[in-house]
A protein has these predicted regions:
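Soluble extracytoplasmic regions of secretory-pathway and membrane proteins
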Residues: 3-552
Length: 552
């Protein structure tokens, strides 16, 4: 018919059905066909609007053009209503209730043996080196994306072996022969796992696979009721490989994204199970994608007084980086919080549980991660080492940035600890214990209180030997007690009376039980001999004053 013919509802309906069918086919082939109205809202509106307008134009029908325009207008209105312009409180509440607590009340004290000294970049190199030890295997596969996780209380980077090409996938139809584990605390602990319980591993469901074993397609075919993101390769406590895939829905009307659970797929067999957040297996470390949490934190901080807060009153924003930290075997996202307009000054930091998304705010003024990195690099500027992004730790109730210092080849050369509250309080060493000892000395010499720690110990005894050491202008007395192999280091900043101590004096020492070193940093020192002398001198002075008063 000329110019499309006469418009009819039946003909229009055919256009609509064909357009939706075409859209469904396209989305299906892209593994994005989701049976959820809120997530698929845009995919519903676009075909309807375009089809209505095109049909109206080709059939000279204003009502269909108007209908298409009205649907676009409806979409715009709904998006505005769901945007922060109107629903700023709903956007700010995406993060949930943010609890404010003291740093020392929840963060576990440092355990040097569990402190991650290997970052992802170095772990990648170690994994590639391990794979390269088997030339025949290295030509068939490559190491996938490494993810940090806790396995039976120990931190490892884990990644599957991926097919290196389509041809390799065809020839290795049973799957790749295992996965790689790289310890985050010991660079000598790198494992290529090809067997489990005496049985060979065959990882079939991978991002590098094709057709029905392609990971994205496999997830889509097993769950079309929610959108998927954050495909994470994780091991259960027995070392069995799985894919943990975040399921999400819309968070505010038809906008934003909110994690609702996970689809867990056996990487070998393809068997799957859908879990809500509340009934997730304990071995799963992460459900909440880091970009979701970053977005929530920024909305929570910037929308404190709505969108039209042009004076930036009380506005907060997260710092550039985000890191994973483990506390009591729970996984958290860490990020610093700054005031808008003050990029280098920290007002606190947040820890967000990577499973349930619960966030805790720790208010403390201090330095940002970037400022701490520059401070650590400044200590060894002659070597031009670069600092890795900091890992937040608790050293004697003091929030502390820990980082490694690497050379131009990416090799770890030093370790650094920087106090969050004062980034000038920094220590650098060539071993973890040496760095910790230096850091504790610096804390003591800067009069930062280290009392009240749950790892504090007390010892009493008689001095056997005492010696003086000058470190960076500070007087440090090393004391050995009888029948005690430890060496107790006492700064004159901690106790002036230590300079009067001598062998044979009875002393009481409080110290931090941190690490395995024989040399121990003391945070409280009492000498019974000098203290008793001080008391006698005080009594004599009081008696003299009283006599003078009587005379008057």
């Amino acid at each position: 018919m000329k110019n499309g013919g006469k418009a009819s509802f039946k003909g229009y309906l055919k256009w609509i059905l064909i357009s939706y069918l075409a859209m469904a086919v396209i989305l299906f082939l892209q593994n994005k066909l989701i049976f959820d109205l809120s997530i698929s809202f845009l995919a519903i509106i676009i075909p309807f609007a375009l089809c209505s307008i095109i049909y109206g134009v080709t059939h000279f029908s204003k009502k269909y053009i108007t209908l298409g325009g009205a649907s676009i207008a409806l979409y715009v209105v709904i998006m505005i209503v769901c945007s922060p312009l109107v629903s700023y409180k709903a956007h700010r509440e995406l993060l949930g209730n943010v609890e404010e607590v003291e740093f020392s009340s929840q963060i576990k004290h440092i355990d040097l043996k569990q402190l991650p000294t290997i970052d992802k970049e170095l772990a990648d190199k170690l994994a590639d080196k391990k794979l390269g030890e088997i030339p025949s295997l290295g030509s068939q596969v490559y190491v996938g994306d490494l993810t940090l996780q806790s396995i039976n209380g120990e931190l490892y980077y884990v990644a599957p072996l991926e097919h290196s090409s389509l041809f390799k996938w065809i020839t290795n139809h049973k799957g790749t022969p295992g996965y790689v584990k790289v310890s985050a605390t010991n660079q000598n602990d790198v494992q290529l796992v090809t067997e489990l319980n005496g049985e060979p591993l065959n990882i079939k469901y991978l991002e590098s696979s094709y057709l029905l074993t392609n990971l994205d397609r496999a997830a889509f075919l097993r769950d079309m009721k929610a959108a998927h993101t954050d495909y994470t390769f994780e091991l259960d406590d027995e070392g069995k490989p799985y894919w943990v895939i975040t399921r999400y829905d819309t968070g505010v009307g038809v906008t934003e994204k909110k994690a609702i659970g996970a689809l867990i797929i056996d990487a070998q067999t393809g068997e799957s199970e859908i879990y809500d957040i509340d009934n997730m297996p304990k071995w799963v470390d992460r459900i909440q994608p880091d970009r979701f949490i970053k977005n929530y934190i920024d909305k929570w901080g910037t929308l404190v007084h709505g969108v039209f807060n042009f004076s930036d009153k009380d506005k907060l924003v997260s710092t550039e980086g985000m890191n994973l930290i483990y506390n009591n075997d729970e996984c958290y996202y860490y990020t610093g919080i700054t005031s808008v307009g003050n990029d280098e000054g920290l007002v606190g930091f947040t820890l967000t549980n990577t499973r349930d998304g619960k966030t805790t705010m720790y208010k403390t003024a201090g330095a940002t991660e970037s400022a701490a990195m520059k401070s650590a690099e400044g200590k060894v500027q002659q070597y031009k080492y670069t600092a890795t992004f900091p890992y937040l730790i608790n050293i004697q109730n003091e929030p502390t940035y820990f980082m490694t210092l690497k050379d131009a080849n990416g090799l770890v050369k030093n370790y650094a600890m920087v106090n969050v509250k004062n980034y000038n309080t920094v220590a650098v060493g060539d071993s973890l214990q040496a760095t910790l000892n230096k850091y504790l000395e610096v804390l003591t010499n800067t009069n930062i209180s280290l009392e009240g720690s749950d790892s504090a110990k007390t010892v009493e005894g008689e001095i056997e030997r005492v010696g003086l050491v000058i470190k960076e202008g500070s007087s440090i007395y090393d004391i050995k007690l009888k029948n005690d192999n430890n060496i107790y280091s006492v700064s004159t900043e901690t106790a002036r009376e230590v300079s009067l101590s001598k062998p044979g004096d009875k002393v009481k020492i409080e110290y931090m039980n941190v690490g395995d070193s024989r040399y121990i940093i003391v945070n409280s020192f009492e000498n019974a001999n000098t203290s008793s002398k001080d008391k006698n001198d005080l009594k004599k002075e009081e008696k003299k004053v009283n006599e003078e008063v009587k005379v008057e």
